[in-house]
Every structure is written in structure tokens, then in C-alpha cells.
């Protein structure tokens, strides 16, 4: 069975944000505005997405 994934796109800058939020952005593999990555849909990834919801856009929920 294939693992479920979600596409995450960074839509706002991480500069000037909390250190923990910048860590979540890099933990998701995002590097710049407009960058899209496909990550496995796990509880830890969902937690990172929820923490930085205002900086990212999620597809495939």
C-alpha cells in the first residue's frame, strides 16, 4: 500500500519569524517562497504544518 503524502508550498517568508517556526519550515524541507515539497502525511508532519499554517499552503488533504 502506498504511503499517503501531502504537497506543502511556502507562500510567506520565514525571515523575522520565531526560531521554532523557522525550524518547522526547514524541517518540512522548504527553502524559499513558492517552493513545493511532497512529504509523507504523518502526525509529526501535520504538527509542523499546523504550527506554521500562516506561511504554507497544503494540497492533498
Swiss-Prot record:
Single GO biological process annotation from the record: translation
Superkingdom of origin organism: Bacteria
UniProt xrefs under InterPro entries: Ribo_uL30_ferredoxin-like_sf, Ribosomal_uL30_bac-type, Ribosomal_uL30_ferredoxin-like
A GO molecular-function annotation: structural constituent of ribosome
Protein name as it appears in the record: Large ribosomal subunit protein uL30
Homology family: Belongs to the universal ribosomal protein uL30 family.
Lineage, opening ranks: Bacteria, Pseudomonadati, Pseudomonadota, Gammaproteobacteria, Cellvibrionales
Entries under HAMAP family matching the protein: Ribosomal_uL30_B (MF_01371_B)
The organism of origin for this protein: Saccharophagus degradans (strain 2-40 / ATCC 43961 / DSM 17024)
Amino acid at each position: 500500500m502506498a504511503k499517503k503524502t501531502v504537497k506543502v508550498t511556502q507562500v510567506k517568508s520565514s525571515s523575522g519569524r520565531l526560531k521554532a517556526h523557522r525550524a518547522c519550515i526547514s524541517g518540512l524541507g522548504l527553502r524559499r517562497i513558492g517552493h513545493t515539497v511532497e512529504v509523507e502525511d504523518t502526525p509529526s508532519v501535520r504538527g509542523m504544518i499546523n504550527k506554521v499554517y500562516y506561511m504554507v499552503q497544503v494540497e492533498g488533504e
